[in-house]
């Protein structure tokens, strides 16, 4: 088991944290031609999307994909950048008021704000990509997004408690499944982050379910999506129209 984990770790670390944008057709080559279910679903995805940007499969892919995709969109939307920056600036105080220790979250928040300030200078895409490929910067962004998700879940614990299995409190769930690095994300994490930052996320779900079409969910329901992600069991990548 330890050897298997090590092999998976080696495979993961050989993949870029965030890749270049690629033609969506690269997905067809990832599955056997006779894998009818996936080939049909990729064809269906092609009706709506043209490109994909992959993320490293390390358990942090949802946060990294969300972070990069939204910040990339902010390079061309100064109004949303100002709104988002104001929410992000205030978020540290919100977390401290909830009981998070200021000195433990400060560095993560500072890195997050630094990156938003970089976006304000309208750098080239390569500069933003460079930040997300720098493991220390990229991981600090992931940690802060995890903290924001945890904070929102705990603030709205009355609502989210119903979705948590195993008799755990929302706080226990956050300490075990949200805040630690490499913990995979599910609907509950996506709902919380989308609402915490007021950024709509659309996820296309590509799995082995019957039928040749890909189902999607928008978080929160009925909102206008800004971030488009592809989910394959255990992993998220970024989609482009």
Where are these regions (language model features)?
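Conserved aromatic-histidine-acidic binding/catalytic patches
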Residues: 12-15, 53-59, 177-181, 227
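Papain-like cysteine protease catalytic cores
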Residues: 18-22, 26-49, 70-207
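Structured, charged interaction cores in eukaryotic nuclear gene-expression proteins
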Residues: 47-68, 75
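Beta-strand cores of modular interaction/reader domains in eukaryotic scaffold and signaling proteins
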Residues: 51-56, 62, 202-204, 228-230, ...
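A short acidic (Asp/Glu
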Residues: 63-67, 73-74, 213-216, 240
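Charge-dense, extended regions
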Residues: 199, 213-241
